[in-house]
């Protein structure tokens, strides 16, 4: 694994650099980089995987600013490292929001993209968007503050991979969540739901697949409809 810091605190973890095919990996928030080790390990058997660690995630000394800033940083990093096109890209939740904007801008063409429960911009009055941000912000703070709430919302028996120690993993996760600054938390929830897109998305011929879980079908209906547009 190679680590390359961005100019403003963002880090890019590189795996499988010996491969010609490239894959951009944009993870969700509230998950440490080690949570994706199994997935990235499998992908790196065939791809040069570039896993993004966002500003404000972990003890980077920086705050997360916005989806727009993140996409600019990722684009700049890729171009600075001579990557002018991607064979594949994956984005989950917040990462799906970043990938949606990345694809819409089209500065770096992508052959295939998977948006996994990706967040699309709210289409509701400003006051409702502010209330939604406040709800999400307070919910995150409560989960980060209380181990009991964390395990109630995300039961270890469901979210711990087979063969892993749930106590150790949740100890590490609880410690990780406490590294988020108030500004980072607020910016994540506002920007992920209110980021901007160009009036006319770029036409690059990317094959896009939207993933969602069995229990998310109803909740993700509006996101799927948005991406189809």
Indicate where each model-derived feature is located.
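Flexible "cap/lid" loop of the alpha/beta hydrolase fold
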Residues: 104, 110-142
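Conserved serine/cysteine hydrolase catalytic core
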Residues: 183-226
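Gly/Ala-rich beta-loop-alpha elbow adjacent to hydrolase catalytic centers
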Residues: 91-99
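Active-site loop/oxyanion-hole signature of alpha/beta-hydrolase fold enzymes
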Residues: 50-90
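Active-site signature of alpha/beta-hydrolase-fold catalytic machinery across serine-
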Residues: 38, 101-105
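N-terminal cap/lid segment of alpha/beta-hydrolase-fold proteins
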Residues: 1-10
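Helix-loop "lid/cap" segments that line or gate small-molecule binding pockets
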Residues: 147-166, 176, 187-193, 211-212
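Conserved HGGG/HGGXW glycine-rich cap/lid loop of the alpha/beta-hydrolase fold
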Residues: 10-59
């Amino acid at each position: 694994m190679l680590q390359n810091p961005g100019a403003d605190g963002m880090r890019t973890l590189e795996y499988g650099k010996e491969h010609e095919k490239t894959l951009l990996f944009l993870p969700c928030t509230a998950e440490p980089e080690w949570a994706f080790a199994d997935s990235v390990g499998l992908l790196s058997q065939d791809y040069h995987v570039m896993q993004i660690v966002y500003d404000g995630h972990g003890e980077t000394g920086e705050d997360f600013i916005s989806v727009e800033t993140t996409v600019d940083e990722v684009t700049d990093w890729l171009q600075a490292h001579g990557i002018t096109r991607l064979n594949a890209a994956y984005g989950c939740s917040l990462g799906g929001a970043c990938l949606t904007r990345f694809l819409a801008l089209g500065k770096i063409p992508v052959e295939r993209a998977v948006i996994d429960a990706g967040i699309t911009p709210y289409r509701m009055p400003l006051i409702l968007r502010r209330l939604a941000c406040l709800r999400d912000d307070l919910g995150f703070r409560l989960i980060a503050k209380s181990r009991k709430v964390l395990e109630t919302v995300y039961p270890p028996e469901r979210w711990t991979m087979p063969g892993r120690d749930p106590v150790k993993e949740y100890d590490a996760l609880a410690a990780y969540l406490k590294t988020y600054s108030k500004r980072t938390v607020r910016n994540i929830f506002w920007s992920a739901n209110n980021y901007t897109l160009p009036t006319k998305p770029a036409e690059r011929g990317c094959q896009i697949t939207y993933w969602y879980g069995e229990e998310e079908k109803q909740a993700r209906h509006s996101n799927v409809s948005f991406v189809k547009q």
